[in-house]
Every structure is written in structure tokens, then in C-alpha cells.
Amino acid sequence: MSQLVYFSSSSENTQRFIERLGLPAVRIPLNERERIQVDEPYILIVPSYGGGGTAGAVPRQVIRFLNDEHNRALLRGVIASGNRNFGEAYGRAGDVIARKCSVPWLYRFELMGTQSDIENVRKGVTEFWQRQPQNA
């Protein structure tokens, strides 16, 4: 199975979700000066920012990470967290990234996610990678 790459703000909601998920994952640094580069296909897990608009929905650190052509080329899908209080903008970062990078938006969960979200993502990620060509 390939990896997960995620970003978590200082609230650590996404970090706690990843810990509960228990799958291999690499964190995009909170410090904008630090960079990472991935070397295998991955699914991105990202929180949504802002009050509901498209502008500002994707964290700057994630934009910087995806602006690296090498990292962007290995992206295979996106999972987004958000807050249902934002209505239609709930999980908007997933929609933005999926459209701009032409990858599927696989799932969204609220804040730290529920146990059901954990189980759905574990199962969905496993099934997603099983459907992918070996050299994808």
C-alpha cells in the first residue's frame, strides 16, 4: 500500500485523526520554510480553512507542497476535513484540490472524525490502492 500525506494545523485535529487511523503517513510541516518531497504515490489528507469561500480553503503549506511538480505528480486522491457549520463549504479544500489536480475526492470528515470515519477511511484507502495499477 502506498502512503498518506497530511497537513495538520496547530489545532492538531487532523494529526489526531491520523494517529487513530494507524496507517503510514508523512506530515507536511507546519513551518512554511520546511519542505518535504514524496517518492511514491499518495493520498492527501487536508483540513479546510476559511469561512466558506474557495479562496483560502487550502492551507498555504499544502499549496506550497503541491506546487512542487514532483509531489503533485504522485498525488492519487484527496480526503478533506472540515466543519459542518460552513454548510456547502464543508471540506471545501478537498473539492479545490481534486479539481485542480484532477484526482478523486475520496472522503470528507468533520474536525477529528468519528470512529465510523476512521473505519470508512481505513477500508476506503485499502480498497483504493487495491484498484490502482501496480506502476501508478
Swiss-Prot record:
InterPro entries: Flavoprotein-like_sf, RNR_Ib_NrdI_bac, RNR_NrdI. SUPFAM superfamilies: Flavoproteins (SSF52218). One of its GO terms (molecular function) is FMN binding. Pfam families: Flavodoxin_NdrI (PF07972). GO terms for biological process: protein modification process. Belongs to the NrdI family. Probably involved in ribonucleotide reductase function. This is Protein NrdI. It comes from Escherichia coli O1:K1 / APEC. The lineage of its organism: Bacteria, Pseudomonadati, Pseudomonadota, Gammaproteobacteria, Enterobacterales.
